[in-house]
Each structure stands twice: as C-alpha cells, then as structure tokens.
Amino acid sequence: MSRSLKKGPFVDHHLLAKVEKAVAIKDKKPVKTWSRRSTILPEFIGVTIAVHNGKQHVPVYVTDQMVGHKLGEFALTRTFKGHPADKKAKR
C-alpha cells in the first residue's frame, strides 16, 4: 500500500539538510546516510549518496529516473552465493 498523497513523501530531515548543503557548496563527496527509508526527491538529482546496507556504505548516484523511489532499493542487503551443486550431477 502506498503512502497517502496528502502526507507527501517521507524524507529524514537530517538527510535533506545534508543534501541541500552539498548542493549549495557543489560538494562532490558522497553524503553518508543510514536512512534507507527516505524517498528520493528531485533536489537529490546529481548527488552521490552513500547508503548503508548493514555492512558498508554503497555509493548511489541519483538520476532523474530514481525520483520517487526509496534509497534502500539501490543498496542491496543480501548477497546470493548460488544454490548448492547437485551431488548426482558430480558423478
């Protein structure tokens, strides 16, 4: 179920302040955040945000097609190591 339109998109205030500051001084360093739940706004376009995936910060360069999605969608938390090999096929 999506969020109500009258509420608007959710963005952590500290993340919004960091991004606005980075845009104002034209800083190219990634903005480090743990806020995977924040929605990407049009103000974030062109900024690299380092999103925490539980182990490390994954750099995410925000483009116009990402607007409206959550930051956590672009920093995967699970790694797939593959299914175990079939023992019958090894013979």
UniProtKB/Swiss-Prot annotation:
One of its GO terms (cellular component) is small ribosomal subunit. One of its GO terms (molecular function) is structural constituent of ribosome. SUPFAM superfamilies: Ribosomal protein S19. Keywords: Ribonucleoprotein, Ribosomal protein, RNA-binding, rRNA-binding. InterPro entries: Ribosomal_uS19, Ribosomal_uS19_bac-type, Ribosomal_uS19_CS, Ribosomal_uS19_SF. GO terms for biological process: ribosomal small subunit assembly; translation. It holds the Pfam family Ribosomal_S19. Protein S19 forms a complex with S13 that binds strongly to the 16S ribosomal RNA. Belongs to the universal ribosomal protein uS19 family. NCBIfam families: rpsS_bact (TIGR01050). This is Small ribosomal subunit protein uS19. It comes from Leptothrix cholodnii (strain ATCC 51168 / LMG 8142 / SP-6) (Leptothrix discophora (strain SP-6)). The lineage of its organism: Bacteria, Pseudomonadati, Pseudomonadota, Betaproteobacteria, Burkholderiales. The gene is rpsS.
